[in-house]
């Protein structure tokens, strides 16, 4: 009996899939293995943070998060994107940032519909829209692609080319995600006049959600004196001292630039990963600097090689930190079971099919590079990811960090299963 079952399983592995030429179980293996690797490393991080081992206490996880987002992730993006990008490729990749914007718009519309049906507790209507509408287009896709490309049997061919192309595509869209996060999301998380929680108003800038990246908060919150006004010293000040017309004009121009810098929140947008992406695109698009920095044997290739070595450490470090952050559990939340479940279903079940439709239409219209399956796979992944982790830092700044932490916890738990299912579908469609 056991022999017959094993024989049947072996036969099923050889059965071709209708959408492609692979086997049923083979396709499932390709899609599930990266998720299994991610889950294993997160579990080890959870174990290291447990009270029985306690190698990753909260202070250690905070330092690890800071190291990842301030050094390791920018190094990975700079080395991989710089090697892959050219001016011609940047023109071919124009739909990647457009896809991020379309994904945010479509996700927000779905979030609005879900919130209108579920009616979350006041004042979490806009909060629910954002939790459904804005996905993680950075570190989680990078982790999944790294795990997928390491497998020599991956459907995208050569492991090194798979990794470089995938990282380049994902990194190319990150700068748009950062702008969306610190403009649209920041405004949508604006608290009501009475605040999300009157008792915690004074603590809103002092605590972090368990899944937030602590190193991001200094980019959002400044340690100003209590009597400091955000517009202080930004507008022209009338002085009794005589000054020339030229000095006055220069001073006003400088003050206008400073005012715009603060008003547009450029300090929040210009994060290390975004700076690395912009530098890689500029230096990689210019033939002279590309040959000088990113080509094997180039005079400055030692710098790129050093970034590659540091970048290789990003994946395990971020997964250990993410697993360690889960040790505290979801925490308390005022959203309730119905709203939390609606966010999970909206983000992981309703958003991906709409994203699949967007990518399919773009492909039919000829907006995507011909015969580049990795390009299409990355576009689909952008619609499949759980809620953005960095939105937790913005939510914390706005006073709803506790609710955001609870949502991030449950969404990432269920995303382990949903991402595997959607990846099976995508691989069958593409191959």
UniProtKB/Swiss-Prot annotation:
Positions in the Cytoplasmic compartment: 51-66, 115-128, 191-268, 328-340, 398-406
One Gene Ontology CC term in the entry: endoplasmic reticulum membrane
Tissue localization of expression: Expressed in seedlings, rosette and cauline leaves, stems and flowers.
Main location: endoplasmic reticulum
Stretches that traverse the bilayer: 30-50, 67-87, 94-114, 129-149, 170-190, 269-289, 307-327, 341-361, 377-397, 407-427
Keyword hit for Cell inner membrane: no
Subcellular location per the Swiss-Prot or TrEMBL entry: Endoplasmic reticulum membrane
Residues exposed to the Lumenal side: 1-29, 88-93, 150-169, 290-306, 362-376, 428-431
UniProt keyword annotation of NADP present: no
Matches recorded under Pfam families: Mem_trans
Superkingdom, natural source: Eukaryota
Protein topology in the membrane: Multi-pass membrane protein
Induction of the gene: Up-regulated by auxin application.
Biological-process GO terms, alphabetical: auxin-activated signaling pathway; endoplasmic reticulum to cytosol auxin transport; response to auxin
Keywords linked to the UniProt accession: Auxin signaling pathway, Endoplasmic reticulum, Membrane, Transmembrane, Transmembrane helix, Transport
The family this protein is said to belong to: Belongs to the auxin efflux carrier (TC 2.A.69.2) family.
Function per UniProt: Involved in cellular auxin homeostasis by regulating auxin metabolism. Regulates intracellular auxin accumulation at the endoplasmic reticulum and thus auxin availability for nuclear auxin signaling.
PANTHER family documented for this protein: PROTEIN PIN-LIKES 2, PROTEIN PIN-LIKES 6
Protein name, per record: Protein PIN-LIKES 6
Organism expressing this protein natively: Arabidopsis thaliana
């Amino acid at each position: 009996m056991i022999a017959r079952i094993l024989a049947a399983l072996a036969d099923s592995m050889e059965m071709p899939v209708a959408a492609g030429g692979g086997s049923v179980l083979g396709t499932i293996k390709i899609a599930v293995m990266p998720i299994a690797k991610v889950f294993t490393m997160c579990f080890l991080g959870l174990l290291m943070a447990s009270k029985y081992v306690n190698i990753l206490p909260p202070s250690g996880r905070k330092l690890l998060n800071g190291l990842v987002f301030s050094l390791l992730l920018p190094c990975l993006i700079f080395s991989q994107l710089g090697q892959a990008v050219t001016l011609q490729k940047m023109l071919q990749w124009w739909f990647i940032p457009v896809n991020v914007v379309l994904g945010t718009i479509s996700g927000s519309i779905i979030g609005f519909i879900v919130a209108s049906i579920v009616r979350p507790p006041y004042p979490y209507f806009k909060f629910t829209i954002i939790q459904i509408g804005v996905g993680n287009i950075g570190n989680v896709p990078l982790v999944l692609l790294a795990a997928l490309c390491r497998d020599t049997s991956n459907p995208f061919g050569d492991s090194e080319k798979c990794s470089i192309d995938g990282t380049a595509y994902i990194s190319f869209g990150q700068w748009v995600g950062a702008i969306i996060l610190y403009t649209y999301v920041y405004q949508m998380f604006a608290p009501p006049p009475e605040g999300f929680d009157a008792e915690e108003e004074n603590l809103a800038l002092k605590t972090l959600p368990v899944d937030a990246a602590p190193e991001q908060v200094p980019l959002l919150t400044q340690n100003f004196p209590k009597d400091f006004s955000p517009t202080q010293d930004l507008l022209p000040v009338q002085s009794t001292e005589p000054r020339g017309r030229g000095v006055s004009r220069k001073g006003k121009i400088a003050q206008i630039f400073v005012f715009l810098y603060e008003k547009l929140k450029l300090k929040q947008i210009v994060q290390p990963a975004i700076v690395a992406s912009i530098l890689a695109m500029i230096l990689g698009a210019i033939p002279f600097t590309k040959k000088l920095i990113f080509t094997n044997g180039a005079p400055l290739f030692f710098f790129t090689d050093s970034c590659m070595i540091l970048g290789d450490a990003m994946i395990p470090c971020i997964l250990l930190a993410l697993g360690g952050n889960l040790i505290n559990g979801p925490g308390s939340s005022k959203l309730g079971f119905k709203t939390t479940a609606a966010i999970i279903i909206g983000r992981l079940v309703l958003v991906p099919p709409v994203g699949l439709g967007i990518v399919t239409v773009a492909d039919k219209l000829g907006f995507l590079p011909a015969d580049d399956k990795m390009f299409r796979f990355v576009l689909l992944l952008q619609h499949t990811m759980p809620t953005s982790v960095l939105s937790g830092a913005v939510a914390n700044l706005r006073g709803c960090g506790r609710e955001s932490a609870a949502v991030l916890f449950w969404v990432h738990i269920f995303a382990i299963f949903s991402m595997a299912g959607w990846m099976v579908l995508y691989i069958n469609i593409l191959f």
